């Protein structure tokens, strides 16, 4: 880390009380004061959940469409044929194809952020699963990316859909907007995300579901959030 970056980070640390547990409103106000990069930084949330994902009944996975969007331009690809391919093109998909498109992906050509597929073509998609899986691009019914309603899936993807999945340690990370967003927009996005996380609480999860939570920017220190306030969001 360069001296310039170290000095900048040290200055940001002075703006965050490391001993304080912030309310969501306080955290959003504070995180907006931490913008220091030369680009529009992403507001990120990190959660530690009281689940053991090694057990199938404790896997937390899903998606939510953020009210204010993500602030990102999303390239959407769709694997579909015939009428569904036409529907995808009309809905604004950036790439639409089937066998030829899958062959391109198999060669390592991945120039999209979200991949949607119709259920009848998932056998085709399975051939490139080893390439898509590690990149988090594999279509899945739980995130609404395996569907016959391709138009709605495209609308969601371009309109601010965020997918989430707990990792092996019980952590979930997500970008929930840009620091340039208004305080109300960020509050709305974070609340919508947390409500969906709470909705996906496994029945097998006992005790405090959200063990810890923190808010930060792409290049800032983190701000500790009050877990109980988040768990109360329904």
Curated annotation (Swiss-Prot):
Pfam families: Ribosomal_L1
Subunit note: Part of the 50S ribosomal subunit.
Cystine pairs: none
One Gene Ontology molecular-function label: tRNA binding
PROSITE patterns per UniProt: RIBOSOMAL_L1
Keyword Ribonucleoprotein set for record: yes
Keyword Phosphoprotein: no
Protein name per the record: Large ribosomal subunit protein uL1
Gene: rplA
GO biological process: regulation of translation; translation
